[in-house]
Amino acid sequence: MVARHRAQAAADLASLAAAARLPSGLAAACARATLVARAMRVEHAQCRVVDLDVVVTVEVAVAFAGVATATARAGPAKVPTTPG
């Protein structure tokens, strides 16, 4: 359970850091996501940008149990459209 929470925290922080860096370009944004995730002791981090959203997926090793995976998205709020 602790590994899952650590993975989610790393994904959340990495995606927010990447979104803040997105104006500098895709490479800079994903480099920042990887840097933040590694600082939080994540074994694997994947970053992708979809429109203006940064999506980060991380994996944290769990002793004797495999891997805990978490994904987070950071970007502009999605405003529901209403017919009108």
Curated annotation (Swiss-Prot):
Signal peptide: 1-39
Superkingdom classification of source: Bacteria
Subcellular location: Secreted; Host cytoplasm
Keyword set includes Secreted: yes
Induction line: Component of the Rv3654c-Rv3660c operon that is highly up-regulated during M.tuberculosis infection of macrophages.
Keyword GTP-binding among record annotations: no
GO biological process, one term: symbiont-mediated suppression of host apoptosis
Keywords from the named record: Host cytoplasm, Secreted, Signal, Virulence
Any single GO CC term annotated in Swiss-Prot or TrEMBL for this entry: extracellular region
Disulfide bonds: none
Function, as annotated: Effector protein that participates in the suppression of macrophage apoptosis by blocking the extrinsic pathway. Recognizes the host polypyrimidine tract binding protein-associated splicing factor (PSF), which probably leads to its cleavage, diminishing the level of caspase-8 in macrophages.
Subunit structure, interactors included: Interacts with human polypyrimidine tract binding protein-associated splicing factor (PSF).
Name of the protein described by the UniProt record: Apoptosis inhibitor Rv3654c
UniProt source species: Mycobacterium tuberculosis (strain ATCC 25618 / H37Rv)
Lineage: Bacteria, Bacillati, Actinomycetota, Actinomycetes, Mycobacteriales
